[in-house]
Regions:
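Metal-dependent phosphoesterase signature
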Residues: 104-126
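Metal-dependent phosphoesterase core characteristic of DEDDh/y 3'-5' exonuclease domains
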Residues: 11, 15-17, 28-30, 34-36, ...
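A solvent-exposed, charged loop/short amphipathic helix patch at secondary-structure junctions
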Residues: 56-58
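Short acidic, Gly/Ser-rich segments with clustered Asp/Glu that frequently serve as metal-coordination loops
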Residues: 42-51, 60-62
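A short acidic, glycine-rich active-site loop
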Residues: 61-65, 112-114
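Walker B beta-strand of ABC/ABC-like P-loop ATPase nucleotide-binding domains
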Residues: 39
């Protein structure tokens, strides 16, 4: 039996912290109980040249030359926060190098990505199949970084970024800030 605790609003969506039979906490989306969502994350060859870029375009694509996709991982969760399925793919660095400093962070060497990876368009196609037609919510930590990485690779490979227009992107970093770092909320809890 689940015991409900602590209803919170994160990015305008109501969530409740619940516990499963083993007393492990998980989030329940109380507004959209039929929703399942996907958390995704890229590992990259580095960071963008300019950190303040809010959206990638053809005009500023060169800002992302130092931030190329090396791997893409994702996990599908139910509305009750239960893991349903995972997706992991290495991406071949066909026209860039994976630096040693990047390898130190994520453990993916240039050689490994070349030998075990696949071209980005193939990985993207499989990722879209993994998402499926019913899921519309994608979640990431600092999601603007992952979204820019995704869109920059799509632009480089001639894939229309408009196919992402129907998705809602949620940022766990922003959710955390809203819940725990807001001075107004901190003041109200004192």
């Amino acid at each position: 039996m689940n015991t409900l605790q602590n209803a919170i609003s994160i990015s305008g969506i109501m969530w409740t912290v619940a516990e499963d039979k083993d007393k492990k906490p998980y989030l329940v989306n109380t507004q959209m109980t039929c929703l399942n969502y996907i958390a995704f994350d890229f590992e990259t060859s580095g960071l963008p040249k300019k950190r303040q870029v809010s959206k990638v375009t053809r005009e500023n694509l060169s800002n992302f030359d130092t931030c190329r996709a090396v791997s893409l991982s994702a996990a599908r969760f139910s509305s009750r926060g239960r893991l349903i399925k995972t997706f992991d793919a290495l991406i071949q660095p066909l026209d860039f190098e994976v630096s040693q400093s990047s390898t130190t962070i994520h453990g993916i060497s240039h050689e490994k990505a070349m030998s075990e990876g696949r071209p980005f368009p193939d990985v993207f196609r499989d990722f879209m199949e993994f998402i499926g037609p019913r899921t519309k919510t994608l979640i990431g930590h600092n999601v603007i970084f992952d979204l820019n990485c995704l869109q920059s690779e799509m632009l480089r490979h001639g894939l229309p970024i408009e196919q992402l227009d129907d998705f809602v992107f949620r940022c766990t970093m922003e959710m955390y800030r809203e819940r725990f770092m807001s001075p107004i909320k901190l003041h109200l809890t004192l």
